[in-house]
Design a protein with these regions (language model features):
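Bacterial N-terminal signal peptides that target proteins for export
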Residues: 2-13
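C-terminal soluble interaction/assembly domains
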Residues: 260-329
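C-terminal motif of bacterial Sec signal peptides marking the signal peptidase cleavage site
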Residues: 20-23
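N-terminal mature-domain "stem" immediately C-terminal to a signal peptide or N-terminal signal-anchor/transmembrane
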Residues: 25-90
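Acidic/His-rich structured neighborhood in mature extracellular/periplasmic domains
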Residues: 84-238, 313
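Extracytoplasmic/secreted proteins, especially bacterial periplasmic and envelope-associated proteins
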Residues: 115, 119, 212, 216, ...
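Acidic/His/Gly-enriched intrinsically disordered linker/tail segments
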Residues: 215-276
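Structured segments of extracytoplasmic/periplasmic soluble domains
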Residues: 40-44, 119, 123-126, 220-224, ...
Length: 329
């Protein structure tokens, strides 16, 4: 089991145009219930069950084996032996057992996730509805996305105070490893894969407005959540940004960070970290994402008839900023 934080396997496609009508029809009736691959694999590993117990998950098993565990596809020689060997590590199996005990009733998660996916796919009918899975990886990817699969590694959502996490993750990372992050992370991963970034990665304005677009859409997919949850903040972190809006903005402008292509300075405002560089020590991390969300929210207030497709396709980031009429308080 390696010490590494989650990443997202992204699909570069926005969907296949010829499937548009099919997808629109499916969106009206499809029930996005999470397929518990994690449960079947646990039974396979602990009950000496035959390989056939996983036969219903062949498509995902290939993604899981090749893309997550790097042990090859399910039809490769020795695949199931390698699978058992990977999960033979005692600490990992202890985590797996805890995951199975924690996630017994998925009713609320299924309900919230299904509603969010339905809303998203109604707004982006060209995107293919996914099969939704749950798996355990040993702290690898948080979310895995392919053209037709969406899966989340549940062993990374056992609670910020889960003892094993202290050996593998920093405190600021553990704060986002609770079960209430499952649905936002499913949806965020799916959006990032299907709505990729277009712009200059070195320019802060481009990056924060893209992130702001995703957070704005997430806020509409999960309308009952607290506003700080869309960013991955707690209430105190969000309020700090609110109280220091002018300081955040002035720091960015005075340091010429908003428009100047500079990957290093841009990344400081976006990365998960205990705090954001250039700002006081009590500033939370990823302040750029908070700012992008604020600007896009202001823009959509000014342009309420803008569809989500139009929002995502608009890459004139300076014009978006201008039309948002954003003014820090």
């Amino acid at each position: 089991m390696q010490k590494q934080i989650g990443i997202i396997l992204k699909s570069a496609s926005l969907g296949i145009a010829c499937l548009c009508c099919i997808c629109c029809s499916e969106n009206k009736t499809q029930d996005f219930q999470i397929i518990r691959f994690d449960k079947d694999l646990y039974r396979y590993l602990t009950e000496n069950a035959p390989d056939s117990i996983l036969k219903d998950h062949t498509d995902f098993l290939d993604v899981f084996g090749e893309g997550v565990l790097s042990i090859g596809k399910s039809d490769s020689t020795g695949f199931f032996s390698r699978l058992k060997e990977y999960f033979s590590e005692p600490t990992l199996m202890g985590i797996y057992k805890d995951e199975q005990e924690k996630f017994t009733d998925m009713t609320d998660i299924n309900k919230e996730l299904s509603k969010g996916l339905h809303i998203f796919l109604q707004q982006f009918p060209q995107i293919k509805p996914p099969k939704v899975y749950m798996h355990v990886s040993g702290f690898f990817q948080n979310v895995v996305v392919t053209d037709d699969i969406l899966s989340l590694s549940a062993d990374k959502y056992l609670g910020s105070d889960y003892p094993v996490y202290q050996d593998y993750f920093y405190e600021f990372q553990r704060e986002l490893m609770s079960c209430d992050r499952i649905v936002p992370d499913y949806l965020s991963g799916f959006m990032m894969a299907n709505l990729p970034f277009f712009g200059n990665e070195d320019v802060l304005l481009d990056r924060i407005l893209y992130e702001g677009k995703l957070r704005y859409i997430l806020s509409k997919l999960l309308p009952k959540r607290k506003v700080w949850e869309y960013i991955g903040y707690d209430e105190e972190q969000y309020e700090w940004c609110d109280l220091h809006q002018s300081q955040i903005w002035n720091t960015i402008i005075e340091n010429h960070h908003l428009f100047t292509p500079d990957y290093f300075s841009t990344s400081q405002y976006l990365k998960d970290a205990p705090h954001t560089a250039y700002l006081p020590a009590d500033a939370p991390g990823k302040v750029g994402i908070w700012l992008g969300f604020r600007i896009i929210s202001a823009y959509m207030e000014q342009k309420p008839k803008t569809t989500w497709i139009e929002l995502m396709e608009n890459t004139d980031y300076q014009e978006i900023l201008k039309q948002s009429k954003y003014k820090p308080q």
